[in-house]
Design a protein with these regions (language model features):
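Acidic helix N-cap motif at the loop->helix transition within catalytic regions
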Residues: 21-24, 52-60, 83, 107
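A conserved acidic beta->alpha catalytic loop
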Residues: 29, 47-56, 75
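Conserved donor NDP-sugar-binding/catalytic core segment of glycosyltransferases
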Residues: 107-121
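Short beta-strand/loop segment that forms part of the nucleotide-sugar
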Residues: 39-49, 71-73
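Glycine-rich, basic loop-to-helix element that forms the pyrophosphate-binding segment
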Residues: 73-90
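Short, acidic, metal-binding catalytic loop of nucleotide-sugar glycosyltransferases
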Residues: 28-40
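Short aromatic/hydrophobic "clamp" motif used to bind/position activated sugar donors
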Residues: 95
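Cell-envelope/extracellular polymer assembly enzymes that use nucleotide-activated donors
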Residues: 8-11, 42
Length: 121
């Protein structure tokens, strides 16, 4: 990619319900993605009705990584409501959704987003 080609910017959303066992590894994996033509502008975590340590774990990431944002739904409202919170607050037109119980491949975001460089998409 030459210097005149713009980066593709995306927002990544994570929906989470009681994911203390995985959320830290997931955020580490997202923050260390191998990116060439894609830039992750923000990672929005929507914690819905969590009763474990998911929220404090995410708060520790928020404190040290400005791209990580946390939205808390005190009552569990379901995945659709959490996705709507993400989409309502995302700053980019390209949005990638992850579930709190996954670990993406090191170049997963690049592979999902880079197709948007094609004007036909």
């Amino acid at each position: 990619m030459d210097q005149t080609t713009p980066q593709l910017r995306c927002s990544v959303g994570v929906t989470a319900y009681n994911e203390e066992a995985n959320i830290g590894r997931l955020l580490d994996a997202l923050l260390s993605q191998q990116l060439h033509v894609v830039d992750i502008s923000e990672i929005i975590v929507v914690a819905s009705g969590c009763t474990d340590n998911t929220i404090p774990i995410v708060e520790s990431f928020v404190a040290r990584e400005p791209r990580v944002r946390l939205f808390v739904q005190p009552k569990r409202e379901g995945k659709t409501a959490a996705v709507n919170v993400f989409l309502s607050n995302a700053v980019e037109d390209i949005c990638v959704l992850e579930s709190g119980d996954t670990i993406p491949h090191p170049d997963a975001v690049e592979h999902m987003v880079r197709m948007f460089a094609d004007p036909a998409v």
